[in-house]
Amino acid sequence: MNIGVIGAGSWGTTLADLLSKNGHAVTLWAYEQDLVERMRKSAKNDLYLPDFTLHEKLAYSSDLGEVAAGKDMVVLVAPSQVLRAVVRQAEPHLAKDTILVSAAKGIENDTLMPMSEVLKEVLPEERLQRAAYLSGPTFAREVAAEIPTALTVASEDENIARTVQKIFSCEYFRVYRSSDIVGVELGGALKNVIALAAGISDGLGYGYNARAALITRGLAEMTRIGVAMVARERTFMGLSGMGDLVLTCTGDLSRNRSVGLELGRGRKLEDILSGMRMVAEGVKTTLSAYQLAKRLGVETPIIEQMYLILFENKDPRDAVADLMQRSLKAEMD
């Protein structure tokens, strides 16, 4: 299969490498022409995945039209806040039967839309019928190292889901199917907010009890938002919900948890972000999730406190105190 991968961050590079290893003809698009030249010469992405040599047959380009044109499949791995613009540029070049796979995690700040809703606004209906959404508990470095990993692909068309499942799966990468697009997407986006909170808790030295409470109650908030958007509750118990949440809240490779750790230790958000090359989606997603919950009329106390910490400069210790002193209630809604 002839595949284009749009986005050469750590995850896009890893997926392109995996697909090339799986025997497909893959071209990886990077915005930076100088990065493309270096990848061609060294078979390494020295900016975002420097410790791994990429598959020898993987091709590279900074020409978006070239990467999108005539492909059987195009994988979208651009950051969520720029995905709309990138897809608009790529769409005129796509073949009629191209399968689109979104592997971007996030909620668009301006519209409060998950990526599937963004694509609905920029793509014709016939293209949306051939779209799928990939999400789950994945650190790019571990997949690049061929460490066993499982995740979920969601599509309205089961045949498309089966095709994507088959193309991506290999001895170390197992893909499950779902038809709950919104649930799979929201799990991958909202867990980043809870990971920031878990990192703050760890940075404050609050220990494992507090982290477990945040993960569990955070999952409840994610599920409430999802159900309000007509996602299936059980989806949040799966790989794209609980699985991704646990990984991102506990794994040392989590960028969002790392940002939270530094906040808990007293560093300023702007100082933390200025020293990061890769995107921590959770910061922007916190704003979107907070506004989305307000719009939906959903109670999300952890997300609300994260908004106050990140955007209103609330002291994290005060936020924890306010969470602990809320009115007492039953655990299950």
Curated annotation (Swiss-Prot):
Enzyme type, top EC level: oxidoreductase
Positions bound to sn-glycerol 3-phosphate: K105, G136, T138, K191, D244, S254, R255, N256
Residues that coordinate or bind NADPH: S10, W11, K105, A140, R255, V279, E281
Provenance organism: Syntrophotalea carbinolica (strain DSM 2380 / NBRC 103641 / GraBd1) (Pelobacter carbinolicus)
Function as written in the Swiss-Prot or TrEMBL entry: Catalyzes the reduction of the glycolytic intermediate dihydroxyacetone phosphate (DHAP) to sn-glycerol 3-phosphate (G3P), the key precursor for phospholipid synthesis.
UniProt keywords, alphabetically: Cytoplasm, Lipid biosynthesis, Lipid metabolism, NAD, NADP, Nucleotide-binding, Oxidoreductase, Phospholipid biosynthesis, Phospholipid metabolism
The protein's name: Glycerol-3-phosphate dehydrogenase [NAD(P)+]
PROSITE patterns cross-referenced by the UniProt entry: NAD_G3PDH
EC number: 1.1.1.94
GO molecular function: glycerol-3-phosphate dehydrogenase [NAD(P)+] activity; NAD binding
GO cellular component: cytosol
Active site (UniProt): K191 (proton acceptor)
One Pfam assignment: NAD_Gly3P_dh_N
